[in-house]
Structure formats: C-alpha cells, structure tokens
Curated annotation (Swiss-Prot):
Organism the protein comes from: Schizosaccharomyces pombe (strain 972 / ATCC 24843)
The protein's name: Elongation factor 1-alpha-A
PANTHER family: TRANSLATION FACTOR (PTHR23115)
Phylogenetic classification of the source organism: Eukaryota, Fungi, Dikarya, Ascomycota, Taphrinomycotina
InterPro entries reported in the protein's UniProt record: EFTu-like_2, G_TR_CS, GTP-eEF1A_C, P-loop_NTPase, T_Tr_GTP-bd_dom, TRAFAC_GTPase_members, Transl_B-barrel_sf, Transl_elong_EF1A/Init_IF2_C
GO biological process: cytoplasmic translational elongation; translation; translational elongation
C-alpha cells in the first residue's frame, strides 16, 4: 500500500432542479463507495418500476429515503475517490437541516461544487434574487469555504451549445464575484451528469471545449473533467499547530473506566498525560487515555472523533456543548457576551434588541439574546449602512452584541473558525447565520481542579 490518500470534504450546492443528485450520484456510482450488490439491487428495482434508464439520481434518492426513515446508511456511500483524495460529500443539500449542518459543522467543507442547470430558464431561476443558489453560495463563503468549482450541467439539453455555456460562465462569474469568490480561481466545467460527459472522461460531444483552468498561488492549473477539478482542490491546512479545542458531543460513564467525554478535535492535539480544562464548566483534570474506534491513540488530531478518559470528574461536572482545551496553552473560557456579524436569512418579522432565539454553535445549543444592534451593514462588502438600527429583517446583515442565557464557550472566527460560526434557530428553522468577531471572556471563579491535575502538574 502506498501512502494513504488525503481526505477532503466537498459540499454540493445549487438549485433543486440543477441535477445535483444525478451528478453527485454519478460520481459516487463510478468512483465510489456504493458496492456492486447495492447497485444491482437498485438497478433491478428501477427496471421493475419502469425507470429502466436507471438515472444515477435513483441511487441518491434511495439513500436519502433510507436516511429520512432514520436508517443510518453506511456513510461510505457518500464517498468517492479521485487519484489524489478520498472525498466525502457533505450532506447533499435539499436536506432540511443543510444550513444548520453546514454551520454547526459536523464537517467543514474544503470546497463547494456549485451545480448550475444549463437548460433554458433553469439557470435564471437558480440565481434569481431569491434563488437558493445565491443563499448557499453566500453561506459557503461566509462560513469560510474559499474554494469553488462550477459545473454547468445538462449540456445535453442545450445541444452542447458553446454560446449557452459561455453565457452561463459570464453570468455565474458576476454572481460569484458578488458573493466574494474570485472567478479566476474557479474552474468552470460543462457536464452532463446524466450522460456522463466531462464527469470522469473528457467529452467528445463538445469539440469546442478546450478545458478549464484556474489560478492558484503555485501558478495556473488546467484540466478537462469534473473529477480532475475536484482532484485539483488545494489540500486544506489542518490546524494541528493551534491550541486544543474539542467541543464535547457526549459524556459517558463507563463501568471500570470512569468518565469518558467524546467529541471531534477541531484544532490542536489531545494526548494522554495532558492537563485539560473544560469551559464554561471550569473543570481542570488530566487526560488518562485517548481512543478512536476502540483503539488507543498517542494523539488525537483535528478531524478525529475521539473518546478520552478523565480522572476524578463526574458526569455531572461536564456536558455536551462544553469545550475541552489545554490548560497551559490558551485554555478555553466561558463568555459573558460576544459581538457577531449576523445575516438574517428567513424571519417573517423584524428582529430588534431583546430577541432571544436558540443558537447552535459547535455542539452547544443555547438561547442567546440580541442585546444590542450595533450597526446594519452591506452583507457583501461589510460596509456600514446604518448606526444602531431599530430592527433588521430578512436579507439584512448586522453587527450585534449577543448575550447567552447561560454559560457557553465560543471563540472569534479568526482564532478558531469551528467555534466562531453559528446558526440562529427559531420556529423550527434557521432564521440567521453568524460569524463571531470578538468575545468578552469570563475568567472562571473558584474552579474545580482535580487531585489528578494537581499531582500531574507538580510532576511536570
């Protein structure tokens, strides 16, 4: 076996009718995690139902249906490989909680693939004023997804028209520029997700197509297919050199072992023997051991979902939403308030000071009050439009001071991105998203330091 391939997460965005499922299904089907047996089973069902042309979307529909019935499907089904990477498709959108998932970041996307329907009228619908496409692209950008690929789909329905492709490239370039991307760094690939043109193999139907190119720090990169474009994603910097931040997903009590917090390492490294602090609980203790998939680790790295055993801490002391960090290296703290840039997505009324919805930030789920609307800003440029507005409504962006209703631990987006973005939930939907600019931290009072931590500290 050669060196293991790098791992990247790709989020697929675009209007519901752009052919996202077919395109994603095609890649997963041809390069991916769906085993032959499952495919044969699906093909047989498709034929029996008269869907004999076996659209790739059928694969995705099946997976989605199973997922929505609460059958957890082996997540490998949402994976495919390129020569350089193992790619995970994050929660193919169209899914209710897409926005929430993208923000609370079960996994942060390294790149977004924007699928545009090339058919007449489709493209226009997708990026009209209220288009979903605009919202998703803006979200991706706001939440720190800085790489983008545009696939112009359904080229087969345009008679493989060069003029139509060029028109869409021009319009889409303007559109993504407004969102914040630089079109020169974005590959534009004409494809047919259904027929397979330019997906994995170069097409023969578009002799005019010379290939895509994008500018990178290292120079110009060129290619033909969508698979090559995904393969050319620049590898993400995994933040191992930052101080540890590990938001807890759960805390278990395991007989004979003790208390075992579980969560995903977002930044830094967790190792046995480390003295860690949990915020906002203010508990400090020693890490006895670190495990992943029931195997003990010398170190848990960013992206790893780990369980770790802590000494002399009861399950009552720490909980989901707490953040674990290194007590000697910028330990996490609770916050009294924080300032954030908030984009209102869909709220039926007006939001003014005093509004207290629930915030989902990393694994925390806590009501926070909009204590003060500091200024209304242009959501693209970030420039101030109005000082101390009385209210904001859907489509607006503002800088607001937020006060959590109970202790919580968050960070500025520029310091620790995964702990610096949040979704505002109300009426069972995501009404706004935000990025934290600054945090007013609270030094813990008489915090609990376990005997194990004191002993281990004295040894050092």
């Amino acid at each position: 076996m050669g060196k293991e391939k790098g791992h990247i997460n790709v989020v697929v965005i675009g209007h519901v009718d752009s052919g996202k499922s077919t395109t994603t299904g095609h890649l997963i089907y041809k390069c991916g995690g769906i085993d032959k047996r499952t495919i044969e089973k699906f093909e047989k069902e498709a034929t029996e139902l008269g869907k004999g042309s076996f659209k790739y979307a059928w694969v995705l529909d099946k997976l989605k249906a199973e997922r929505e019935r609460g059958i957890t499907i082996d997540i490998a089904l949402w994976k495919f490989e390129t020569p350089k990477y193992n790619v995970t498709v994050i929660d193919a959108p169209g899914h209710r909680d897409f926005i929430k998932n993208m923000i609370t970041g079960t996994s942060q996307a390294d790149c977004a693939v924007l699928i545009i329907g090339g058919g007449t009228g489709e493209f226009e619908a997708g990026i009209s004023k209220d288009g979903q496409t605009r919202e998703h692209a803006l979200l991706a950008y706001t939440l720190g997804v800085k790489q983008l690929i545009v696939a112009v789909n359904k080229m087969d329905t345009t008679g493989w028209s060069q003029a139509r492709f060029e028109e869409i490239v021009k319009e889409t370039s303007n559109f993504i520029k407004k969102v914040g991307f630089n079109p020169k760094t974005v590959p534009f690939v004409p494809v047919s997700g259904f027929q397979g043109d330019n997906m994995i193999e170069p097409t023969t139907n578009m002799p005019w197509y010379q290939g895509w190119q994008k500018e990178t720090k290292a120079g110009v990169v060129k290619g033909k297919t969508l698979l090559e474009a995904i393969d050319s994603i620049e590898p993400p910097a995994r933040p191992t050199d930052k101080p540890l931040r590990l938001p807890l997903q759960d805390v278990y009590k395991i007989g004979g072992i003790g208390t075992v917090p579980v969560g995903r390492v977002e930044t830094g490294v967790i190792k046995p023997g480390m003295i860690v602090t949990f915020a906002p609980a203010g508990v400090t203790t020693e890490v006895k051991s670190v495990e992943m998939h029931h195997e003990s680790l010398d170190a848990g790295l960013p992206g790893d979902n780990v369980g770790f055993n802590v000494k002399n801490v009861s399950v009552k002391d720490i909980r989901r939403g707490n953040v674990c960090g290194d007590s000697k290296n910028d330990p996490p703290m609770g916050c009294a308030s924080f300032t954030a840039q908030v984009i209102i997505l869909n709220h039926p009324g007006q939001i003014s000071a005093g509004y207290s919805p629930v915030l989902d930030c990393h694994t925390a789920h806590i009501a926070c009050k909009f204590a003060e609307l500091i200024e209304k800003i242009d959501r693209r440029s970030g420039k101030k439009i109005e000082e101390s507005p009385k209210f904001v409504k859907s489509g607006d962006a503002c800088i607001a001071k937020m006060v959590p209703s109970k202790p919580m631990c968050v960070e500025a987006f520029t310091d620790y991105a995964p702990l610096g973005r949040f979704a505002v939930r109300d009426m069972r939907q995501t009404v706004a998203v935000g990025v934290i600019k600054a945090v007013e931290k609270v030094a813990p009072g008489a915090a609990k330091v376990t005997k194990a931590a004191v002993k281990a500290g004295a040894k050092k």
